[in-house]
A protein has these predicted regions:
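Single conserved hydrophobic/aromatic residue that forms the stacking wall/gate
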Residues: 1-12, 171-179
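Predominant activation on well-ordered alpha-helical scaffold segments within soluble catalytic domains
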Residues: 48-52, 81-85, 119, 123
Length: 179
């Protein structure tokens, strides 16, 4: 066959990336939308502070209908909310089919934080956009990470607390004429 999967083991070819609720992988927590299926979306994103700083510049990726993933480190929940608000008001979040939040780690609560937690940010975000918001995907500044094929076309399936991201990386073998 001229087209075949590249870089994925047999299990991943058949099942996609399965992230189970028993492991601290991409779960919806308390799902805003219990069952969702997103088809043919560009997977893109990265560090939230970097993306927020690029809004309004020619360097900000112009992805519509994508699956946006973001994470950060050493950022308090109110700062995460501020950066997501910037993406919201720039129209970025409304153009996505899904938003996947990574693990926001290594911030220290201060006395003035008054208990404002990341879950409050997640609840607020879910109230602001129509796209499903998934949480706790292990990527970025965490010890155990999943591989995310940035720029690949993916499908996303959410059933209750389980989320699956499917990706098919295809290549064409060079023809003898190309050699």
């Amino acid at each position: 066959d001229a087209q075949e999967s590249r870089g994925l083991g047999d299990v991943y070819k058949r099942q996609g990336w399965r992230m189970h609720k028993e492991k601290p992988h991409a779960t919806t927590g308390k799902p805003a939308v219990p069952n969702v299926y997103v088809k043919s979306a560009t997977l893109w994103g990265g560090n939230l502070a970097v993306l927020a700083s690029l809004v309004g510049t020619p360097y900000f990726p112009q992805v519509k209908g994508g699956v946006l993933f973001v994470e950060d480190v050493h950022e308090h929940p109110y700062r995460v909310e501020r950066m997501l608000t910037q993406l919201l008001h720039a129209g970025v979040l409304a153009q996505q089919k899904a938003v996947v939040l990574g693990q926001f780690t290594n911030f220290k609560l201060a006395p003035h934080d008054k208990g404002y937690k990341l879950q409050s940010v997640v609840d607020w975000l879910r109230s602001q956009i129509k796209a499903p918001v998934l949480t706790n995907l292990p990527f970025g500044h965490v010890e155990t990470k999943v591989l995310l094929p940035v720029g690949a076309t993916v499908s996303l399936s959410v059933e209750e607390r389980d989320a699956l991201i499917y990706c098919c990386l295809l290549y064409t073998s060079p023809s003898p004429r190309d050699s």
